[in-house]
Design a protein with these regions (language model features):
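Second-shell residues forming the walls of enzyme active-site clefts
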Residues: 24, 51-72, 76, 86-88, ...
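Preference for extracellular/luminal or secreted protein segments
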Residues: 1-41, 255, 273-369
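Surface-exposed, active-site-proximal loop segments in enzymatic domains
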Residues: 91-105, 141-152, 193-194
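Second-shell loop/turn segments in exported
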Residues: 28, 49-52, 102-110, 148-155, ...
Length: 369
C-alpha cells in the first residue's frame, strides 16, 4: 500500500498535512484561489454543500474535476451531507427523503438497509465517495435545536439497530458511511454551530444512552466516525470531545476497538472557533487521534490549518508520528472502498421509481408511527 509521507522531509510533511484536510468550496465551480490551494496543499478530500449544487450533471462534473486535479495513488475522497429530511444537499430530481426518524419509525431493519443502499447509489451517481450519514445520536432532549428527527429514534436501542442497518446498506453499495457525532449530540439544548454545548450526565448514563449506537456502528464496520464539538465534564472536564484523548482514544479506539478514520466536525463552528486557538485545536485533536479535519467553507482557514499541521509536525516528533498514522488510516479507507469499486451508478438512479417508493413508504408509515 502506498502511503503518503513516510519520510521526514519538509515536502512530505506538507503532503501529510494536506491529506488530513477535507475542505469546502465557495460556489458551483472552482475559482483561481481554490485551484491554487488544491495545487499546493493537495487536500485529502472535499465536501460539497447546497451552495455548490446547481443540478446533478454539474455536481458530477465538479466531482470529476476535483478528482482529476489530484491524480495518482491518493485520489481525494469526495464528501457530502445527504442524510434526508432537512439535511439534503442534492435535491430534486434526486429523491427527497423524509427525516431518518420516519425510517426508524417504520421499524423494519431491512427497510432501513434498503434506504441506506438507495441513498448510497444516488450520492455515488453524482460522484461522491463518502456520505456523512447516519446520525448516531439519540434524540433524548426535546429542547435539542439541531438533532431532533435527524435521529432514528428516541431510545438507544432503536438508534443502535437502525444505525447498523443503514451503515450496512450504504457500504454494501460502495459508499463510505459516517457515524456522527461521537460521543453524542442528542442530549444538548444548544447548537454547536453557535456555541459549545455542555452535557451534564454521569458516566453510567452516558454509557447507557449515548454510546451504544456508536458501538453498533463500529460493530457494523463503519468507515468513519465524526466527533462532536460537545463538552462532557464527566468524561473530560477540560476539552470538548473533538479535542479529548480520554474520549476519542480512550473510549472510541481502545474500549470500542475502533481502528478506522476519525473526522472532526467543522473547525468553523463557534463551539470551537474563537474559543480555542486553531493550532491548539489541531494539536489537541490530533493527540486525541483525530485523523482528518473538516474546514467546510473558508479557504483562508483551510490554509491556516494546513500551515498549522505542518508546523506541529516540524516541531513535535510525536505529532509527526501521529500524522503518519492518520494518513495510514485515511489511505486504508481508500484501499477498502475505492480500489475495487463497482461501476458508478448512472444519473437515472436519482429519483427513480424504486427510491421514490421507499421515500413515500417512509413518509406514510413513519409519520403515523
Amino acid at each position: 500500500m502506498n502511503v503518503v509521507g513516510l519520510t521526514t522531509t519538509t515536502a512530505d510533511r506538507k503532503r501529510r498535512a494536506g491529506q488530513r484536510l477535507v475542505v469546502g468550496l465557495a460556489g458551483a465551480s472552482l475559482d483561481a484561489d481554490e485551484r491554487a490551494f488544491i495545487r499546493d496543499a493537495r487536500p485529502g478530500g472535499f465536501i460539497l454543500f447546497a451552495r455548490n449544487v446547481e443540478e446533478p450533471r454539474q455536481v458530477l462534473e465538479l466531482n470529476r474535476e476535483l478528482k482529476s486535479l489530484l491524480p495518482g495513488e491518493l485520489p481525494p475522497i469526495r464528501c457530502v451531507d445527504q442524510e434526508g429530511g432537512l439535511v439534503q444537499r442534492v435535491k430534486a430530481p434526486a429523491t427527497v427523503w423524509p427525516p431518518m426518524r420516519f425510517v426508524g419509525n417504520v421499524g423494519k431493519l431491512e427497510f432501513t438497509r434498503a434506504v441506506g443502499r438507495a441513498l448510497a447509489r444516488e450520492v455515488r451517481a453524482v460522484g461522491f465517495d463518502l456520505d456523512f450519514a447516519p446520525v448516531a445520536d439519540v434524540d433524548s432532549n426535546p429542547k435539542n435545536p439541531i438533532i431532533g428527527r435527524r435521529a432514528f429514534a428516541t431510545s438507544p436501542e432503536g438508534v443502535s439497530r437502525h444505525v447498523a442497518a443503514f451503515i450496512e446498506g450504504m457500504q454494501d453499495e460502495g459508499c463510505i458511511a459516517c457515524a456522527k457525532h461521537f460521543p453524542g449530540h442528542g442530549d444538548t439544548a444548544t447548537d454547536s454551530h453557535l456555541e459549545l454545548p455542555v452535557v451534564e450526565k454521569d458516566p453510567g448514563e452516558i454509557e447507557h444512552v449515548e454510546l451504544p449506537p456508536f458501538a453498533a456502528a463500529v460493530a457494523a464496520g463503519v468507515g468513519t466516525v465524526m466527533t462532536a464539538h460537545v463538552l462532557y465534564p464527566a468524561l473530560d472536564e477540560d476539552a470538548p470531545a473533538t479535542m479529548s484523548r480520554r474520549i476519542l482514544d480512550g473510549i472510541l479506539r481502545r474500549r470500542m476497538g475502533y481502528g478506522g478514520v476519525i473526522v472532526s466536525d467543522d473547525l468553523e463552528m463557534k463551539a470551537v472557533r474563537g474559543r480555542y486557538p486553531l493550532e491548539h485545536q489541531l494539536a489537541k485533536a490530533s493527540e486525541a487521534t483525530v485523523d482528518v479535519f473538516l474546514v467546510c467553507k473558508e479557504l483562508h482557514l483551510a490554509h491556516e490549518a494546513w500551515e498549522g499541521l505542518i508546523r506541529l509536525a516540524e516541531t513535535d516528533k510525536l505529532e509527526d508520528d501521529r500524522a503518519v498514522a492518520a494518513c495510514r488510516r485515511w489511505h486504508a479507507l481508500r484501499e477498502r472502498f475505492l480500489r475495487h469499486l463497482a461501476p458508478t451508478p448512472g444519473l437515472d438512479e436519482l429519483g427513480c421509481a424504486r427510491h421514490a417508493e421507499l421515500a413515500l413508504r417512509a413518509a406514510a408509515e413513519g409519520a403515523q408511527s
